[in-house]
Regions:
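Hydrophobic helix-and-loop "lid/oligomerization" segment in the mid-to-C-terminal part
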Residues: 1-126
Length: 126
């Protein structure tokens, strides 16, 4: 069994509990900047994996500050290719695990992600 720092564990739990369900199939959440010393890309990946445990969630996205950029970690199951989504945001990855790094705020990253998802849904790309 893997164990976590209690503060990091509680940050992950908070992020999961505050997730927004977008377009009925996509979970989006953020990690707070005030605990940035505890947040790493692995933290974001753990949250993204946890969000996939919910029924009807096809893909999950976690936006968080890391080393003066905003990271988006993406995970998926079923038929959603998160690599394609992250490529639209300047990132990359694999079918079920991908990421992007943006030069903006967390809120702006969430907005860009939602715009990208909306466009891709309308165009039948996802």
């Amino acid at each position: 069994m893997f164990r976590s720092n209690p503060t990091e564990y509680l940050l992950r739990a908070q992020a999961v509990s505050q997730a927004e369900i977008f377009e009925c199939s996509y979970a989006i959440t953020t990690l707070p900047a005030d605990n940035s010393s505890l947040i790493t890309p692995a933290t974001g990946a753990k949250v993204a994996n946890s969000l996939l445990e919910m029924d009807n969630i096809k893909a999950s996205f976690v936006c968080f500050p890391y080393k003066s950029q905003i990271y988006i970690n993406a995970r998926s199951i079923d038929d959603v290719n998160v690599q394609l989504i992250m490529e639209k945001l300047g990132g990359g990855g694999h079918l079920s695990a991908a990421a992007a790094q943006l030069e903006c705020t967390v809120d702006e990253a969430v907005d860009k992600l939602k715009e990208t998802l909306t466009t891709m849904l309308k165009e039948g790309e996802i």
